[in-house]
Amino acid sequence: MSTPTLTLSEDRLLPRESSALAAAREIYRSTKGLPIISPHGHVPVSWIADDMAFSDPTSLLITHDHYVNRLLHANGVDLEDLGVGRKTMSEEDNRRAFRILCEHWRDFAGTAMRYWLVDQLVGIFGITDRPSPENADRIYDTIAERIAQPDFRPRALMDSF
């Protein structure tokens, strides 16, 4: 059985009505290369200011994203299991938290968090397998490998966008 995949549609945030879609595509085409200036983010600002390498997939995608950890908590997950309020987590704790995210993937259906996570998985990390308990460790390892590379440091990523 093949693993369900994730994809990114160029039209994913555009209206569906045909005349509006054509106009939106033109606006997007003419502006997509411009920089985004936004004070909003879900990682500690010191990571960007100090250009610190991301330590692990869990702290990057789960622990510091209050939307993600609140949705998981609303579905019965203890915040401490996601690293919230903890100063340190072991490698196994980080993997366990990432497995929890993958086990609860269905709970993100129809949410902005799902959109953001898919955009990050596919668009930044090149991961097209839909997260599940069966592939959680493989996805974790792929992200961990990528964030260890200089091209995935915070400022390098910002420059790439």
Functional labels for PLM-detected ranges:
Residues 2-35, 41-161:
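Metal-cofactor-binding active-site regions of metalloenzymes
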